[in-house]
Amino acid sequence: MIVLGLEGTAHTISAGIVDEKSILSNVSSTYVPEHGGIHPREAAVHHADKIYDVIKRSFDNAGLKPEDLDLIAFSMGPGLGPCLRVVSTAARALSIKYSKPLLGVNHPLGHVEIGRKLSGARDPIMLYISGGNTQVIAHLNGRYRVLGETMDIGLGNMLDKFARDLGIPFPGGPVIERMALDGKDLLELPYSVKGMDTSFSGIYTAAKRYLSLGKNKNDICYSLQETSFSMVVEVLERAMYYTNKNEILLAGGVARNDRLRSMVNDMARDSGYKAYLTDKEYCMDNGAMIAQAGMLMYMHGARQDIMETRINQRFRIDEVPAPWIKDENSISFKDKGAESIITNGEFYGRSVVFKKRPEKSYRDKRLDLKIRLERMKNEFYIMYYLHKTGNAPIVYDFDRFDMVLTIERINGLTMNDYFKSKYDENVIRMIADAVAKMHGLRISHGDLTPNNIIISDKIYFIDTSMGHLRCSDEDIADDLFLLYESMKSLYVNGHEMIKHFENEYSKNVEDYNYYKELIKKIESRRRYV
């Protein structure tokens, strides 16, 4: 099967041709603004001017003609409206002229599938970082799911904005990477991770302030990279634990950054995962990735009438079925958490687990020590207060020098393991009661996923290191949002589970509708919703 793919979501117009085995050609032209960032209409003018030449060269390089095609695929979204309209119009014109079937493709799906094609990865979790996107994506229950993402600006956008403050034209990320190599001092920047989601606007504001104070520019660039990259690699590692998968795929324009690539490699090596780093040429937006995704969709039954190919600027990857992937959950985490190593033992005759937070080699040592100590102290205090509800194990000892917590051992199954084999409405109600009790004390968990809930004779919460005492209403809504998203992603009957949870939780919490509105606001901050 021979497929032409046309990409044009942002700054790059590209045409690529693939078959089942290889990439036959890939030709691109990138719009570079004279000043500032990308101007959508100017980029669209560039695309309209270059698209004929890009398509012609792609056919010439492949030694093919339009008549040889079996399918035309184009990037339907997400992206900049004027740019998307140029590429979709060209794709429709080719489809009509040569009587070829047409498919609109989700742009992030293209990044996943070209990465899999080039690397041989089977069922990876993808860390996708570009100018507009920062997402952790995994295939679960028939389609790709967004497990975590930025709640404001993309990481690449943040780097480009700061580069403009330095007087560096677009694209500024590569220059920041070079400047960071000469940085030494780690400046304190907000480390903004909430559960599986991240935020970069606060980091940008703080970096801009350091610039106004006259701090060394190389040090600011170094700190900007170390902090923001550590955040996304941490969320990626948590996603690996959360899904039990063992393959990592790195993609997107920012994935060309050598420091980010080394951090992902270090994390994978230390944790026993396989890391696949997309070839730098194909990290950038390209037509071949759209062709590859379109081919897989078509081979698995996807068809679109031309009237169904309207662009969608807010097109999310989790809207697209992906039946060609077989989920492979092959890693057991009985002796480790996302950030810890667990060993069983005794403490003065009591059965306990020793939870150690080891160094993370991918992080700057100064940042790593700060995060580990803060998280461990926070976990100790929250577990202490939460134990009063009966829904947390006892913490017997806190060794801040060796970074070890000694915790009562609970015999039971995580919620994730429990619901793999059966569905129990009563257990959902027990979980809802326990969560309501925790929130009633104004305690938030901070990472309320099925791997951090143990089902035994009652419900226990573990790993509260990202939670809050005297928490805000939004902290509570964040807990619920993360738990609901986990249920929808991990379980076929996730929506039914949420319904039963809500019914029970609302009995124990005043004005649950208020929290539902907060959850909607949190969801609205995600990209393309």
From Swiss-Prot:
What does the cofactor field's note say? Binds 1 Fe(2+) ion per subunit.
Q: Does the keyword ATP-binding apply?
A: yes
Q: Where does ATP bind?
A: D335, K336, G337, A338, E339, S340, I341, I342, K355
Q: Where are the transmembrane segments?
A: none
Q: Which InterPro entries match?
A: ATPase_NBD, Bud32, Gcp-like_dom, KAE1/TsaD, Kae1_archaea_euk, Kinase-like_dom_sf, RIO_dom, tRNA_threonyl_synthase/kinase
Which Gene3D superfamilies does its entry note?
3.30.420.40, Phosphorylase Kinase, domain 1, Transferase(Phosphotransferase) domain 1
* Amino acids binding Fe cation: H107, H111, Y128, D285
Q: Which residues bind L-threonylcarbamoyladenylate?
A: Y128, I129, S130, G131, G132, D160, G173, E177, N257
Q: Which residues form the signal peptide?
A: none
User: So which cofactors does this thing need?
Assistant: Fe(2+)
Q: Does the keyword Transport apply?
A: no
Active site per database record: D447 (proton acceptor)
What's its catalytic activity?
Answer: L-seryl-[protein] + ATP = O-phospho-L-seryl-[protein] + ADP + H(+); L-threonyl-[protein] + ATP = O-phospho-L-threonyl-[protein] + ADP + H(+); L-threonylcarbamoyladenylate + adenosine(37) in tRNA = N(6)-L-threonylcarbamoyladenosine(37) in tRNA + AMP + H(+)
Q: What is its main location?
A: cytoplasm
Subunit structure of this entry?
Component of the KEOPS complex that consists of Kae1, Bud32, Cgi121 and Pcc1; the whole complex dimerizes.
* HAMAP family xref list: Kae1, Kae1_Bud32_arch
Similarity annotation: In the N-terminal section; belongs to the KAE1 / TsaD family.
Q: What function is annotated for this protein?
A: Required for the formation of a threonylcarbamoyl group on adenosine at position 37 (t(6)A37) in tRNAs that read codons beginning with adenine. Is a component of the KEOPS complex that is probably involved in the transfer of the threonylcarbamoyl moiety of threonylcarbamoyl-AMP (TC-AMP) to the N6 group of A37. The Kae1 domain likely plays a direct catalytic role in this reaction. The Bud32 domain probably displays kinase activity that regulates Kae1 function.
Name used for this protein in its record: Probable bifunctional tRNA threonylcarbamoyladenosine biosynthesis protein
Q: Which organism is it from?
A: Picrophilus torridus (strain ATCC 700027 / DSM 9790 / JCM 10055 / NBRC 100828 / KAW 2/3)
